[in-house]
Structures are given as C-alpha cells and as structure tokens.
Amino acid sequence: MPTINQLVRNGRLRAAKKASTPALAGSPQRRGVCVRVYTSTPKKPNSALRKVARVRLTSRYEVTSYIPGIGHNLQEHSVVLVRGGRVKDLPGVRYHIVRGTLDAVGVQDRKQGRSKYGAKKPS
C-alpha cells in the first residue's frame, strides 16, 4: 500500500483501454481491397451461410469483414469501405463493409432501413 506522499509523487497508472477495431487505426472507416469473398457458418445455435470478405486495408491490416444485406456484387479486387462493428455469431469478424460506397452497390428493392444498406429512395 503506497503512502500519500508516494501517490502525490507518482500517481496511479491508468489501465489502457483495448481498441475493439485496431485495424481502423483511429479512423471511422478505412478503404480496402477484397482479397477473398466467401461464406462462413455461424456459431452454435444459429445456422446460415453468412457472406464475408477478407479485406486488405490501407492501414496495412488484413481483416475479415461482414457483407450486410441480401445479395452483393463483391468479388476479388473490389474496392470497399470498411467500418467497425462485430458480428456476434461469427468469431473473428469485427468489421462491416459499408454498402452503397465505392464498389459495393446498395441492396436492391430495399424499402425500409435503407440508409444502412445504401439503397436509394424508391420513386
């Protein structure tokens, strides 16, 4: 147990917070190039084929990103924008691809919650 005088001289070390999205390097989003586009199966109680992409970012990290929405046009060498946000039932997937920007087109025939999927307003 330190004395008051020792605490006045040195103080206590603050525990450093661990970043949940280290590959973004403090940025809100990062641009990257798809290295591999594939499907993955979720953890135990769930069952599906989730669409994911391995992306090499401008911060020189390579991360696994989730492709949200129904249907996509991504393939190898597609340029995408990556944001933070994990997928709870896919281990190791801590990033999302932003739909409607760069090479990732918005979801077709989307009427509600359009902004999350880069869909234009239906006319």
Swiss-Prot record:
The keyword tRNA-binding applies. It comes from the Bacteria. The modification 3-methylthioaspartic acid is found at D89. Keywords: Methylation, Ribonucleoprotein, Ribosomal protein, RNA-binding, rRNA-binding, tRNA-binding. InterPro entries: NA-bd_OB-fold, Ribosomal_uS12, Ribosomal_uS12_bac. It holds the Pfam family Ribosom_S12_S23. One of its GO terms (biological process) is translation. GO terms for molecular function: rRNA binding; structural constituent of ribosome; tRNA binding. GO terms for cellular component: small ribosomal subunit. Belongs to the universal ribosomal protein uS12 family. Part of the 30S ribosomal subunit. Contacts proteins S8 and S17. May interact with IF1 in the 30S initiation complex. With S4 and S5 plays an important role in translational accuracy. Interacts with and stabilizes bases of the 16S rRNA that are involved in tRNA selection in the A site and with the mRNA backbone. Located at the interface of the 30S and 50S subunits, it traverses the body of the 30S subunit contacting proteins on the other side and probably holding the rRNA structure together. The combined cluster of proteins S8, S12 and S17 appears to hold together the shoulder and platform of the 30S subunit. This is Small ribosomal subunit protein uS12.
